[in-house]
């Protein structure tokens, strides 16, 4: 895989101006993904790596979007502002985050935060994504039932991981209870299966 990614690194550098290279493989293995870490050249003295999770079999429901690279932090002033990259639509991300939260094997509080942000700040309506979630679950051979219950069941685990996993990633982390309640209201309103 390392050698097959060389052309990708070159294409990313050409398209975005960002220099990447292989760092290490992830210790955990999966049947439907390949996970590894890339190192990148940047201005920060701390760890300059990013985790990459390539899903091997996935159904995209919404078309990719062409978006400008955002420079949200002063420290990232070496990111080019005049480049664009292809990304998942916000609807695709919200559908995936909802399904990730409902997956018993996944316990990432970032999924909860992202879903909260998408529904509270980006205007994403989960009810409009129910069909997309059904398609994705059918593709995975999983039933589309009990999504909200599965997420509610994980409250204690997500709460326990909230600060430790997210506090260093943002300047103003909202309170877990506020975020969880808002997502629960959104799920009830969406009336998901």
Please provide the spans of the model-predicted regions.
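Structured mid-to-C-terminal alpha-helical surface segments
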Residues: 1-193
């Amino acid at each position: 895989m390392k050698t097959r990614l060389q052309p990708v690194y070159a294409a990313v550098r050409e398209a975005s101006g960002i220099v990447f290279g292989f760092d290490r493989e992830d210790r955990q293995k999966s049947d439907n993904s390949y996970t590894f870490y890339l190192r990148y050249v940047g201005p920060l003295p701390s760890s300059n790596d990013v985790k990459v999770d390539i899903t091997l079999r996935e159904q995209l429901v919404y078309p990719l979007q062409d978006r400008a690279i955002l420079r949200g932090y002063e420290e990232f002033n070496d990111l080019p502002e005049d480049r664009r990259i292809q990304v998942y639509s916000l609807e695709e991300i919200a559908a995936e985050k909802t399904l990730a939260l409902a997956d018993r094997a996944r316990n990432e509080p970032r999924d909860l935060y992202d879903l909260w942000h998408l529904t509270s700040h980006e205007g994403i309506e989960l009810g409009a994504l129910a069909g997309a979630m059904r398609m994705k679950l059918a593709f995975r051979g999983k039933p589309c039932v009990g999504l909200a219950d599965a997420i509610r069941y994980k409250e204690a685990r997500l709460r326990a991981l909230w600060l430790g996993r997210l506090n260093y990633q943002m300047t103003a982390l909202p309170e877990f209870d506020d975020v969880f309640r808002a997502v629960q209201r959104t799920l009830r309103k969406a009336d998901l299966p």
